[in-house]
């Protein structure tokens, strides 16, 4: 670890795929409480800008921090990627503090599209922020556009809170001149912020929250000490369904269960977690997980690898102390309990955006202050991989699981999805057969539309047959290379329970690079949040799908795009009753 005079921390991480990865602690949307919710997220969208033909890049805003990364591709170099990312924050050697109203307006529209996307595909319910005075969704809404000047002032104010002590930088290689470049830019920031934010309100403990969730989860408040953080790292590397959350200076260990009986035993104090010393901790974490640790605990004064001897040699005492603290919090009701609930009728409170939720007090009724049993935890395997075809009945459940667990990755191709994970076969089956997970997986049917129409365009099966088997979709014909013939009509209007645009496009020079560039152009115009595309077996032919509230504008953009020599697009209007009759009148494609 290299520490600049203003406390910027720089790490060389030659294992990561990114060229540069930067995080800013104490800079997430928890800072929006008592201001305009969404300022942090809007700032993230305003800052990131790059040439998608030369770079891959992204950014994210969480409760307590913001992070950005950039990777060079094609003819660009690592040095180019580093300078591109730094340019998001500095202009002519000075920290950016000017944002045009037109750009703010476009990005607010993009935020509304992101809200729509996330609520169609996920359940975006941030319980901790809500209990601390924020909302269940804190990413920004379209009504921010009514206060553009105030929003701009808040954005400038937020930039002035950045200080060296908040900055963490991972670089793949620290090339010649790179360290000096960092000193001239992020190293020029004050060690402490020019504007000190107000303290984050303390979340309320001793609550039961009934909300959509794939698991029965208990958030246990523990002290944010070094030993507890090392204990969390030990548990995270060893077991599934254990993680942590922070808000302000508070730390919660999150423990999830698939069995309601075990969950209730844990809550009543009659059972403790069965934690055993079963392996050596290697700290082989992803760069995302490492960055999150440094940002959530900015007071860490050493490289995490400096603690690898301590976490292994002292694991017994660390885990005993952590177990005792967990149990004390259960007895004292320093917990937030999440109980899976999918009823739209049950509600006893709402946030300012009128999202309904049930919040109850966690009482001491039935507490047993002497545990007499232990609960086994799901152990991690080194690695596992499965391939699921689009016709497999478990397709959507596996997609749901990957969306709910950050350590599961999936890649999509023309035939199916390849999933990498570290679960045993028995544990995967137990999760997917659990009552709460099944309800959660089916509570957001919008994600299925992407695969319904992919099946329609790629297989040649009728929409009636596909809809009749929507729980499993239909297996594609892959024995022969399909030749897709486009019909005369380029637009088919349907009514579904989501608003989206999808279809197939073909072009002589069409490739993934041009589609990514197209996606970023649509994002800059505020018309979409993201766009998925799948390369079909027919030459230069892709299937596109994007959720959007601006369907006509997106259709017009795609319809007039000169890269497409042929196209067939479906435009969906959101409604209570599905109507796909337009797809039955003509033969849209012939396979």
Swiss-Prot record:
Gene from which this protein is expressed: OPG085
One biological process term in Gene Ontology: viral life cycle
Protein keywords: Hydrolase, Late protein, Metal-binding, Metalloprotease, Protease, Virion, Zinc
Gene Ontology cellular component annotations, sorted alphabetically: virion component
Keyword Protease in record: yes
Residues annotated to bind Zn(2+): 41, 45
Residues of the active site: 44
Domain of life per record: Viruses
Organism placement in taxonomy: Viruses, Varidnaviria, Bamfordvirae, Nucleocytoviricota, Pokkesviricetes
Source organism per UniProt: Vaccinia virus (strain Ankara) (VACV)
The protein's name: Metalloendopeptidase OPG085
SUPFAM superfamilies reported in the protein's UniProt record: LuxS/MPP-like metallohydrolase
MF GO annotations: metalloendopeptidase activity; zinc ion binding
Cofactor dependency: Zn(2+)
Cross-referenced Pfam families: Peptidase_M44 (PF03410)
Cellular localisation: Virion
The UniProt record lists the keyword Hydrolase: yes
E.C. code: 3.4.24.-
Modification comment: Undergoes proteolytic processing during the course of infection. May be cleaved into 46 kDa and 22 kDa products (Potential).
Protein function: Probably involved in maturation of some viral proteins by processing them preferentially at Ala-Gly-|-Ser/Thr/Lys motifs. Does not seem to be responsible for the cleavage of major core proteins.
Cofactor comment: Binds 1 zinc ion.
Similarity comment text for this entry: Belongs to the peptidase M44 family.
């Amino acid at each position: 670890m290299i520490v600049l005079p203003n406390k910027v921390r720089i790490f060389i991480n030659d294992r990561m795929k990114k060229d540069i990865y930067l995080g800013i602690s104490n800079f997430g949307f928890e800072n929006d409480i008592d201001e305009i919710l969404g300022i942090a997220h809007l700032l993230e969208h305003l800052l990131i800008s790059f040439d998608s033909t030369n770079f891959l890049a992204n950014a994210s805003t969480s409760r307590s921090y913001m992070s950005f990364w950039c990777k060079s591709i094609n003819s660009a170099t690592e040095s180019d990627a580093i300078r591109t990312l730094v340019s998001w924050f500095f202009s002519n050697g000075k920290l950016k503090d000017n944002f045009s109203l037109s750009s703010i307006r476009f990005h607010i529209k993009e935020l509304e599209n992101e809200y729509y996307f996330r609520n169609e595909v996920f359940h975006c319910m941030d319980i901790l922020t809500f209990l601390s005075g924020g909302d269940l969704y804190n990413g920004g809404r379209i009504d921010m556009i009514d206060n553009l000047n105030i929003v701009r002032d808040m954005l400038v104010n937020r930039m002035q809170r950045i200080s060296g002590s908040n900055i963490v930088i991972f670089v793949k290689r620290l090339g010649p001149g790179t360290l000096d470049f960092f000193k001239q830019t992020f190293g020029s920031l004050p060690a402490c912020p020019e504007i000190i934010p107000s303290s984050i309100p303390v979340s309320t403990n001793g609550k039961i929250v009934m909300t959509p969730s794939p698991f029965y989860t208990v958030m246990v408040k523990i002290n944010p000490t070094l030993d507890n953080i090392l204990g969390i790292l030990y548990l995270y590397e060893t077991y599934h369904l254990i993680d942590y959350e922070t808000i302000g200076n508070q730390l919660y260990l999150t423990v999830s269960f698939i069995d309601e009986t075990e969950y209730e035993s844990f809550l009543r104090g009659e059972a403790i977690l069965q934690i055993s010393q079963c392996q050596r901790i290697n700290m082989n974490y992803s760069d995302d997980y490492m960055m999150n640790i440094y940002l959530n605990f900015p007071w860490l004064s050493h490289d995490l690898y400096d603690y690898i001897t301590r976490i292994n040699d002292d694991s017994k005492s660390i885990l005993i102390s952590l177990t005792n603290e967990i149990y004390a919090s259960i007895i004292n009701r320093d917990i937030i309990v999440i109980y899976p609930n999918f009823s739209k009728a049950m509600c006893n409170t709402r946030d300012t955006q009128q999202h309904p939720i049930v919040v109850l007090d966690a009482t001491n009724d039935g507490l047993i202050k002497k545990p007499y049993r232990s609960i086994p935890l799901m152990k991690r395997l080194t690695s596992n991989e499965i391939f699921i075809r689009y016709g497999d009945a478990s397709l959507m459940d596996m997609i749901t699981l990957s969306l709910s667990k950050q350590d599961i990755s999936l890649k999509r191709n023309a035939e199916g999805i390849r999933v990498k994970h570290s679960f045993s076969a028995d544990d995967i089956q137990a999760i997917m057969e659990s009552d709460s997970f099944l309800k959660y997986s089916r509570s957001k049917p919008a994600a299925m539309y992407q695969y319904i129409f992919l099946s329609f365009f790629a297989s040649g099966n009728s929409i009636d047959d596909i809809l009749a088997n929507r729980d499993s979709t239909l297996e594609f014909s892959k024995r022969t290379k399909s030749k897709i013939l486009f019909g005369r009509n380029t637009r088919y209007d349907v009514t579904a329970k989501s608003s989206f645009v999808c279809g197939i496009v073909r072009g002589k020079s069409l490739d993934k690079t041009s589609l990514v560039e197209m996606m970023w152009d649509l994002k800059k115009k505020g018309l979409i949040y993201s766009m998925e595309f799948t390369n079909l077996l027919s030459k230069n032919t892709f299937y596109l799908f994007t959720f959007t509230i601006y369907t006509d504008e997106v259709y017009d953009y795609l319809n007039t795009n000169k890269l497409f020599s042929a196209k067939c697009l479906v435009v969906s209007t959101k409604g209570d009753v599905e109507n796909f009759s337009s797809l039955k009148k003509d033969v849209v494609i012939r396979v």
